[in-house]
Amino acid sequence: DKRTDSDFSPKPTIFLPSAAETNLHKAGTYLCLLEKFFPKVIRVYWKEKDGEKILESQEGNTIKTNDRYMKFSWLTVTEDSMAKEHSCIVKHENNKRGVDQEILFPPIGKAFTTINVNPRDSVLRHENVNNATDLEDCMKGRKDMLQLQVTTTYAFYTYLILFFKSMVHLAFVVFCLFRRAAMSCDDQRS
């Protein structure tokens, strides 16, 4: 049985809110994509870091992909709690060592202070980086991470648009087929 020698715990991918979203709406949405888990039963909830209260969040349906499952969960954070860290807690029977996964999301304000006019000062202030090569590596890593997030977000919306376009096309084709079938039935009666 291939399930005994494979890792079937949820694999998280996180998406942070865009600067445009936080500036325009004075709120931000954290998104957690959980992939490649089995079995289907999973529980996802959100908390402030080190908090006990479960926050109101949304989630999509659990979707089967080949022999495993995936699920989205998202939390919209209002302006008054944007400065706090948040955690996405994942309960699943195949979590490593049987411990709930806790996926940390940085404060929204802090996530954007690293992308400012003088990023060198920002990195030094928040991470105490003293070595110039460490600083450059850190900045390159952040740039790569931001590029990955932007690319993934664009890919997600592109596939979503293509999906809806396919649904409209399918509806049109089905309509034409039923119309043609109805016309041929009318011709046979006459």
Swiss-Prot record:
Record's keyword terms, sorted: Immunoglobulin domain, Membrane, Receptor, Transmembrane, Transmembrane helix
Subcellular locations according to the entry: Membrane
Protein source organism: Mus musculus
Cytoplasmic topological domain: 179-190
CDD domains: IgC1_TCR_gamma
Protein known as: T-cell receptor gamma chain C region 5/10-13
InterPro entries hit by this protein: Ig-like_dom (IPR007110), Ig-like_dom_sf (IPR036179), Ig-like_fold (IPR013783), Ig_C1-set (IPR003597), TRG_var/const_region (IPR051117)
Region C region, residue ranges: 1-157
Disulfide pattern: none
Transmembrane residue ranges: 158-178
Cellular component GO terms, alphabetical: external side of plasma membrane
Bilayer topology term: Single-pass membrane protein
SUPFAM superfamilies in UniProt: Immunoglobulin (SSF48726)
Transmembrane helix listed as a keyword: yes
